[in-house]
């Protein structure tokens, strides 16, 4: 994949070359999207809109730390949607990981989560965030146990994952109406990078085959159900629906 690769660390250790080789990235000086190594983290920038700033994954500080410490925890809609109850903490595959926010919330309340991300740039951002998170004295221990990244296309990987999870979580890219400034910024940068999720409808059936208990699909409240498959089971928040579908139980 072609993208502008930039190193602002001041180091001459070849980290950019290692990054490019690992994720199959090719430097393109004229690309409007840039993946930038800064002294703090790896970030994505839209060069023709510098005011948008950089997008990076941060599990340790910022909004994620606030959500972990002061958010609803088990009471969050995503936790209810995957079925967390009492001692039941399902094993989850997040097949559309994005920046890993919902996966992190589920991991923080005790679920083991495998994140799938097919875009190599987004996978590189997630990997960078995980590396920093794993090294953190406060959250590193449980984060290593509960949150992992698999770089693969969900459409193919969903048929190959073992062991099977109890829950598959899907949050496909959908054109957002007006949202908070942060989401708007991220969506603009993200959609410039990955484009619309045109094959998202194809995820529902393999997800239902893989999950032993349920599939949860996060949708904006105005969006039709994924693959136009309606379900009476949903958890509804102010702006989203978490549509719930039955999985395929394990056979003896």
From Swiss-Prot:
The keyword DNA damage does not apply. S-adenosyl-L-methionine binds at residues 101-102, 117-118, 153-154, 171. It catalyses: guanosine(1516) in 16S rRNA + S-adenosyl-L-methionine = N(2)-methylguanosine(1516) in 16S rRNA + S-adenosyl-L-homocysteine + H(+). Pfam families: SAM_MT. GO terms for cellular component: cytoplasm. Keywords: Cytoplasm, Methyltransferase, rRNA processing, S-adenosyl-L-methionine, Transferase. Its EC number is 2.1.1.242. One of its GO terms (molecular function) is rRNA (guanine-N2-)-methyltransferase activity. InterPro entries: 16SrRNA_methylTrfase_J, SAM-dependent_MTases_sf. It is found in: Cytoplasm. Specifically methylates the guanosine in position 1516 of 16S rRNA. Belongs to the methyltransferase superfamily. RsmJ family. HAMAP family: 16SrRNA_methyltr_J (MF_01523). NCBIfam families: PRK10742.1. This is Ribosomal RNA small subunit methyltransferase J. The gene is rsmJ.
